[in-house]
Amino acid sequence: MRKLVVPNVFFEEAAEALREGKSVRLHVDGQSMYPFIRGGEDEIEVVPYDGVTPPEPWCCPFYQWGGNYMIHRFIGMNGEKWRMLGDGNLYRIEEVPQREIIGLLRTIYHTDGTEQDCRDSRWLRRAQWWYRLRSIRRFLIPLFRLLRI
């Protein structure tokens, strides 16, 4: 199977649709949100963000940072900036102005046919625990990949 890398211009179009109030469904690549999102396999639904509502703890905003569009976990605030960390990342925290937040992750569509509502309180609590395990993620992530968890 040939891998197709979609240029960032596609995500610009998705961002524009979100700004127009439309939801978008995207096939994601990359491993920065593993194990919650499997890059190259899962699809996600992103809904528009109103630009006003305070973020729900552990939600996953869609935003532009460093010229790229991303979905990472919201982990807190630093003044007016939202702090983000990918579930598969160990150290790099992005600080994003609220005006750069375009949408919020609503649903993950897994390849096995299951769907994950990203507003579900149990899912958000699991994300919080995963964040607390940052110090041992370097060992857990390879183990999870090996076991296909």
Regions found by a protein language model. Give the residues of each.
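Extended hydrophobic leader/signal-anchor segments used for secretion and membrane insertion
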Residues: 1-149
